[in-house]
Amino acid sequence: PTYSLSFGDKTVIKPSKLGLELANDTDLTDGFELVATKELTFDDTWQPVWGETKDIRNHYNELLAELRQPSTGRLMNLRFRVYDDGVGFRYEFPVQPNLVYFVVAEEHTQFAMAGDHIAWWIAGDYDTQEYDYTESRLSEIRGKMAGAISDNASQTQFSPTGVQTSLQMKTDDGLYINIHEAALVDYSCMHLNLDDKNLVFESWLTPDAVGNKAYMQAPAKTPWRTVMVSDDARQMLASNLILNLNEP
């Protein structure tokens, strides 16, 4: 499966691949057929226990794509929620006889950038977030990585182009883009690894001691992968997209 994202007439995410690689099992990356789609519009207001505002509006259009992998008979759903200021999407696995307990070896969620954006980033590290932010073009991350890493008692970098979420970017034509996640429950946190030749980020999950990324039992779902976008930098701070996707 693939997806793409635009903001008005501007491309935010070029066609990007989705899928999960399973440990010692058939991967959930390709060979799917579309079984059904469901759409809905949701609009409600809720009140947080505390926060900057009394009322928060949760307004989105949703698309649920139900997929089936004929070679295995397995089912995987992709749920997208589109807001005025971005999108959230996740993988879902309904109850089914051919997929009950499974181990995620890798998540191959891609974010193909439409240009060599300016980015504000922290070096990807399994053990610490105690680094200063570095500002650079995406293509400069590799060259600036060594200087972005300061001494720390616990450090495990995973790639010379790996960065942490949330990742904030700005395009040359004035769009602000943020990649992050929401509803992180019983799953590994997501970093991003950059293919700096093609300017494609891919999810990079923190492994456990034996290298696995998640242990799941259907029915199950992954965290939301979020992309916020606006032509106003202030909207990045004002957005409630991630709050709305963090279900109680």
Model regions: which residues?
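N-terminal accessory beta-strand-rich subdomains and adjacent acidic, glycine-rich linkers
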Residues: 1-247
